[in-house]
Amino acid sequence: MAGLLSTFDTFSSRRSESINKSGGGAVIPGQRSTVSVFVLGPSVTDDADKLFIATTFLAHSLDTDKQHSQRGGFLVSLLAMAYSSPELYLTTNGVNADVKYVIYNIEKDPKRTKTDGFIVKTRDMEYERTTEWLFGPMVNKSPLFQGQRVAADPDTLLQTYGYPACLGAIIVQVWIVLVKAITSSAGLRKGFFNRLEAFRQDGTVKGALVFTGETVEGIGSVMRSQQSLVSLMVETLVTMNTARSDLTTLEKNIQIVGNYIRDAGLASFMNTIKYGVETKMAALTLSNLRPDINKLRSLIDTYLSKGPRAPFICILKDPVHGEFAPGNYPALWSYAMGVAVVQNKAMQQYVTGGTYLDMEMFLLGQAVAKDAESKISSALEDELGVTDTAKERLRHHLANLSGGDGAYHEPTGGGAIEVALDNADIDLETEAHADQDARGWGGESGERWARQVSGGHFVTLHGAERLEEETNDEDVSDIERRIAMRLAERRQEDSATHGDEGRNNGVDHDEDDDAAAVAGIGGI
């Protein structure tokens, strides 16, 4: 029997391995599009000319009259300006199954009177029409930088800060757009300016060169449509981490932005590990968490198998990235979010609402996180030499800290119905106390009402009890059973009282039951 159970435990990970394993056979290349990339030739030496070309690339990347592949090519041209050898940069990082980059040089000819003396050429020929298309008159639909709205002079910035700093400010902002462009496009503009603030404060990005909101949205739309551009940027981060130690200031700033890009779209997966598993609370022994734990183990194996590109599986749209969504391990995720909103106040703003939210596990996570016994790690007691007296004092302090806040946090955001659990403490007392409290529950503690929710109705919790100051140790299965018992009793009491209450106050409690059922908490 033990061998059979171990087979089931490892099935999830072995299944993922078999799905992702190559089936052999011939590799048939797919269709690739051709993208033009422009690089500076050796004759372009003036810093003012270089900055002008950089802003020209940026303007073309925002031109909605051009195809997205062309706009993506201009962003690649802009990113390549950070390197002394753009050709080597593209050869190292730009190998892609979707596109083939064709490189054109931009040279400066003092004898030319048109297009500011610039000419687009290759080793064999010059491209007059392409030059006019690239450097001809353009009508910007909106300013590129916020400084253009107050008539800031780029030449003054160039003389004050130098070309590398000005170019770096532009390129760093393109990288910041990538942080939210793929995984959270709705919050792109807000997320961009939040991340930018640190670079504003340290002087990396000058106020006159800050992108406008329209520029941010335009770059984000190109990134979402041009996966080859995103792949190039990810490969840039990978090669920075593995190949070089002599990074320029711009490259170091790109690495800082890369820390925000890593694991983008994997917050649910990482938070489930952090708050659900690494806290090592006894609730992990529950049988209904076992399948999700096995699933999480399989996902960890999949993540590690991706090597240095693992943190980018979401923005790279790796076929396996959907497996990391919390809907694939809902019970464990719900439990972890319950622990998180208690242990980390910032997590109370995290979106925990969703159709896959298991309300009972969400409440259980909060209950065990509030329990002083669960907060003490037995694994560290011997290592740290903690005495029994010290543990008792610690329990006392923890009880005092949490005693004033008995409220349960409700799920936020998503599609969840707001369910306010006002001081609805789950009793962690012994079985005898639980039975005694259940019998005298309604008359002793009265009725508490949650705040109003949409539709003008209320979700009520009748006679929710307070925790006793001193809590005895008990098995987690007892906790789970007690939660189920409380919910069942509240359903029975509500069903018995709904008829009279409806006649007395005219409230439609049938809709309350429907709302509560949708929220996953029965007939509270």
Curated annotation (Swiss-Prot):
Any GO molecular function: molecular adaptor activity
Single Gene Ontology BP term? negative stranded viral RNA transcription
A cellular component term, taken from the record's GO annotations: viral nucleocapsid
Q: Region Homomultimerization: start and end of each range? A: 440-461
Name where it's found.
Answer: Virion; Host cytoplasm
Q: In its keyword annotation, does this UniProt entry include Ribonucleoprotein?
A: yes
Q: Out of the domains of life, which is the source?
A: Viruses
Region Disordered: list its residue ranges: 487-524
Q: Where is this region: Ntail?
A: 405-524
| InterPro entries linked | Paramyx_ncap
Annotated residues for binding of RNA = K180, K190, R195, Y260, Y350
- What functional role does this protein have? Forms the helical nucleocapsid (NC) in a ratio of 1 N per 6 ribonucleotides, protecting the genome from nucleases. The encapsidated genomic RNA serves as template for transcription and replication; encapsidation by N is coupled to RNA synthesis. Forms the encapsidation complex with the phosphoprotein protein P. Before encapsidation, the newly synthesized free N protein, so-called N0, is chaperoned by P.
The domain-related comment in the record is: Ncore is globular and carries regions required for self-assembly and RNA-binding. Ntail is an intrinsically disordered monomeric domain in the C-terminus.
Q: Which family does it belong to?
A: Belongs to the paramyxoviruses nucleocapsid family.
Name of this chain's protein: Nucleoprotein
What is the organism field in this record?
Sendai virus (strain Fushimi) (SeV)
